[in-house]
Amino acid sequence: MNKQVDILFLAADSSRSKAYAQVIQHSGLSVSRTLLLKKKKAKGTNSPPCGKSASHDLKIVMPDLKIPLIETVEQISDKFDVIENYGGIKNSGIIEYISTHRPKLVIFSGYGGELVPKEMLGLGIPFLHIHSGFLPKYRGSTTVYYSLLNEGNCGVTAILLKPEIDNGDIVTRRKYPAPPSGLDLDHIYDNAIRADLLSEVLTEWNENQEFKEFIKQDESESETYYVIHPVLKHLAILSLR
């Protein structure tokens, strides 16, 4: 087992969670517990795409999405449990699980669009979320594309969650170079840059068991991006070299 930190990894069975687990392993860290959230697979549905890789010089770990999440979790987690037929983050069993084990930190890697309920955030345990976007300037779910169009790079921000979307205190943030043409943006690049910042944050937490400094978000600087027109999305992809 790698060097352990008292953390619960609250993980959807997703490409993002795979990237997080793999970078934790690569960084020589581990977590005390993982709670894996597995949705019931609908009949006739396919597995998520593994994403296209490409040669790059980004100097970050690219996830191998062909590796099952459970395989990496077994390597990084002292103990893990699974919720089968997962129906949503408001499941009372999740709150009970967190209350029982009382980790010092929760890494939240839920399914897209999920908001951690106030009851869970009120447990007095910090929930760490890695947002793809340089906060407060880029809020929402399509920030990778708008950031590429506007600035030619992409930002990532580590925040401690509050009930409001993307509105928590900033632990740290960083801008990353644009990916090369041909690299899958949604499943590879986006998750890789999030995971890279997560590694940095967990290394700090492992040393101090706390975050010593925060940046408060300035609402006057914020912009929210949810929907992107297919033409704009295509232009963002074409901008890559």
Where are these regions (language model features)?
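One-carbon transfer enzymes
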Residues: M1-R241
